[in-house]
Design a protein with these regions (language model features):
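Conserved beta-strand hairpin/beta-sheet module of binuclear metal-dependent hydrolase folds
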Residues: 1-62
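Active-site metal-binding motif and surrounding structural segment of the metallo-beta-lactamase
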Residues: 46-47, 51-91
Length: 91
């Protein structure tokens, strides 16, 4: 089983627009984080946990070619707003 953390930030992402804290001003790649999502891969199956606004970017960065299931943890926008971008997986 492979677990990939696609995003680990808050609902605003990091860096946060207009924020001048050390993390948001940092040039270290670890301080540039997408919104929360996890991909679980096992025996050719891909299960995605949450589909936030960074979904498209997360799929492209990680070269995900298919999704078999999606688990939505709750209905806040930072966990579901990327649903429209799932369409290419159905073609």
């Amino acid at each position: 089983m492979q677990i990939t953390f696609l995003g680990t930030s808050t609902s605003q992402g990091v860096p946060v627009i207009g924020c001048e804290c050390d993390s948001c001003l940092s040039h270290d790649p670890k301080d540039n984080r997408l919104r929360s999502s996890v991909l679980i891969s096992e025996k050719g199956y891909n299960i995605l946990i949450d589909v936030g606004p960074d979904f498209r970017q997360q799929m492209l960065i990680n070269k995900v070619k298919k999704l078999d299931a999606i688990l939505l943890t709750h209905e806040h926008n930072d966990h579901i707003i990327g649903m429209d971008d799932i369409r290419p997986f159905n073609f």
